[in-house]
Curated annotation (Swiss-Prot):
UniProt keyword list: Aminoacyl-tRNA synthetase, ATP-binding, Cytoplasm, Ligase, Metal-binding, Nucleotide-binding, Protein biosynthesis, Zinc
UniProt-listed GO biological process terms: cysteinyl-tRNA aminoacylation
SUPFAM superfamilies, per database record: Anticodon-binding domain of a subclass of class I aminoacyl-tRNA synthetases (SSF47323), Nucleotidylyl transferase (SSF52374)
Gene3D superfamilies xref list: Cysteine-tRNA ligase, C-terminal anti-codon recognition domain, HUPs
Motif ('KMSKS' region): 265-269
Protein name stated in the entry: Cysteine--tRNA ligase
Species this protein is from: Chromohalobacter salexigens (strain ATCC BAA-138 / DSM 3043 / CIP 106854 / NCIMB 13768 / 1H11)
Binding-site positions, Zn(2+): C27, C208, H233, E237
Length: 461
């Protein structure tokens, strides 16, 4: 099995520290707001990885933390006039509901930062004792970045370049502008915990170093997260953990790709920011999961109406193949399983694995017509391999009937109307072209004109 390692910037043969057992830590969310579609990407990617490793016979200890104390949490609780614990419990429950709808299995352990403050304080003290950290005059404790020789190895950054590009610090308590906070002194009225340096709360980076090593040991197999965490969060985790323990922190670093919306970066300022629950109000959960798996986990995903329509149509093809066949385990001679494993063993290439499943679905459709006796075994194979990805778990009839009412006319008729509109536009008969567009819009079919022609989506799909 080959996995791309962000640290070495290449694919490597994956060999767990303990034969047959994988210890994996993934950075979870800061629970001050609802999860967005970018969080869903990370959740689904590492759920897929966990499912596949277990299917291949590994025992997986999957740990994903919860950051339940942070500046953003304090600010949101104050804005809401809500106790911090009430806010975080509400958001944790919402996260579990969202990921459950997406078919994401719960991690084995979900450590919370507030439950590990003693471990965090102990790690900070160890770093001070070793000369890697220092208490400052303002009550904060900072990490000495230049003291750690390997700083920048994950993000491939040079310290001097970082120093040259850093802004002038208003806070003069640091020895060096590159130093980052491990422990924040509490302001009056803020949530805080006692420490040798005064009441305060942990910095974000040290939380993950302490929780991951407490749960999985000083060195473990896989550390994952979103693409925005490579620097500074994961870079700082390495610096903290390896300085504290004197050992390599993580063998394989994995990062999921970003989610873009209509080819733009997702952000609240652009108005293209979507929470998972907003997305699931308009789209079936399995359609969203399929979209998130249709590309390689490291590739960026474009979240757009036509991409969701493609995902729905792909699922309909699979469920159409499975419809009317009772799956029964049996021999399937065409090597689909071997091809599926080869794709997934190549850095969890779900795009290639789904291509294999499309071939299997085509053979199942042929067997239903030409060799019905072979269909049950093929259906079983398709259900099992799809299940490894967390797909095809619904009753085919139910899935197809749920989507049947969405199209007010056949796809062939829609395409014919689009072609008639194109001909009208070519003849400069814009009244007819606009009339066709309006006619389809009245039926809930939205046309999108692009450089490569016209595509269509069902409104609200």
């Amino acid at each position: 099995m080959q996995i791309y390692n962000t640290l070495t910037r290449r694919k490597e043969t994956f060999t767990p520290l303990d034969a047959g057992r994988v210890r994996m830590y993934v950075c979870g969310i800061t629970v001050y707001d609802y999860c967005h579609i970018g969080h869903a990407r990370v959740m689904v990617a590492f759920d897929m990885i966990t499912r596949y490793l277990r299917w291949r016979g590994f025992e997986v200890d999957y740990v994903r933390n919860i950051t339940d104390i942070d500046d953003k949490i304090l600010k949101r609780a104050e804005e809401n006039d809500e106790p911090i614990a009430a806010l975080t419990e509400r958001m944790i429950a919402a996260m579990h509901e969202d990921e459950g709808r997406l078919g994401v299995l719960r991690p084995d352990r979900e450590p919370r930062a507030t439950a590990h403050v003693d471990d965090i304080v102990a790690m900070v003290q160890r770093l001070i004792d070793k000369g890697y950290a220092y208490p400052a005059a303002n009550g904060d404790v900072y990490y000495r970045v230049r003291r750690f020789e390997g700083y920048g190895k994950l993000s491939n950054r040079d310290l001097d370049d970082m120093r040259a590009g850093s802004r002038v610090e208003v806070e003069t308590a640091k020895e060096d502008p590159l130093d980052f906070v491990l422990w924040k002194a509490a302001k009056p009225g803020e949530a805080s915990w006692p420490s040798p340096w005064g009441d305060g709360r942990p910095g974000w980076h040290i939380e993950c170093s302490a929780m991951s090593t407490c749960c999985l040991g000083d060195t473990f197999d896989i550390h994952g997260g979103g693409p925005d965490l490579v620097f500074p969060h994961h870079e700082n985790e390495i610096a903290q953990s390896e300085a504290a323990t004197g050992r390599p922190y993580v063998n394989t670093w994995m990062h999921a790709g970003a989610v873009r919306v209509d080819q733009e970066k997702m952000s609240k300022s652009l108005g293209n920011f979507f929470t998972i629950r907003e997305v699931l109000e308009a789209h079936a959960p399995e359609v969203v999961r399929y979209l998130l798996l249709a590309s390689h986990y490291r590739s960026p995903i474009n979240y757009a109406p036509d991409a969701l329509s493609d995902a729905r149509r792909s699922l309909e093809r699979f469920y159409n193949a499975l419809q009317g066949v009772a799956p029964v385990a049996g021999e399937v001679a065409a090597g689909y399983r071997e091809r599926f494993i080869a794709a997934m063993d190549d850095d969890f290439n779900t795009a290639e694995a789904l291509a294999v499943l499309f071939d299997l679905a085509r053979e199942l459709n042929r067997a239903k017509q030409e060799a019905p006796a072979h269909a049950p075994a093929l259906a079983h194979e398709l259900k099992e391999l799809g299940g490894v990805l967390g797909l095809f778990g619904q009753d085919p009839e139910g899935f197809l009937q749920a989507g049947a009412g969405r199209l007010p006319m056949s796809e062939e008729d829609i395409e014919a109307r689009i072609e008639a509109r194109a001909q009208a536009k070519k003849a400069k008969d814009f009244a007819t072209a606009d009339g066709i567009r309006d006619e389809l819009a009245a039926l809930g079919i939205v046309l999108k004109d692009g450089r490569d022609g016209t595509t269509w989506v069902v409104e609200g799909d």
